[in-house]
Amino acid sequence: MISNYVRNTLFNFLSFFLIAFSLYIFIALVSYDSSDPAFFNKTSSLNINNLGGPLGANVSDFLFTIFGQASFLILLIGIVWALQTIFFKDQYNSRIKIIIRFVSSFILLISFCSILEYYFANNSGGYLGKIVFINLSNALGFIGSLVFLVIFLIPASSLSFNFSWLKTVEIFGSILISFFFKTKSFLLS
């Protein structure tokens, strides 16, 4: 049996590693150059313009080809998970919750890729978005598939990022009310 100290230290180490790895992948994605020799792009040129080097060129090419612009969502999910592990103690954390978060992150990624594929051109959703959206559109039509994807996107984002929509709306409402009263008192004075 692993003690709580060792387990927490291991989780913190993995979280910091995930943040550093996500930062490297972010640099590789931002400096992506389609002319770099990479995983899906074989060229005779040996010149690599990606700031992540040959590994960054391969990783960014793979992510952009498969997931499109949703590659940045993968990084966001990883960073949010790492920050929540480091800074917030979840009293309801369990193996089933971790599995649900993984599955909901995957559903969120698929839905986001498909919506990007519909709204933006040039393969913005990657191969995954194209395949899923074309098959859903054939089965449900364009509007039906968009409704289906949004219905999955909303709860998947809540489960993946570990937040409550009700608490978020409540906080937003209290901010609006306090802003309204401050504006009213300012205008009346």
Question: What function would you assign to each model-found segment?
Answer:
Residues 1-189:
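Alpha-helical transmembrane segments used as membrane anchors
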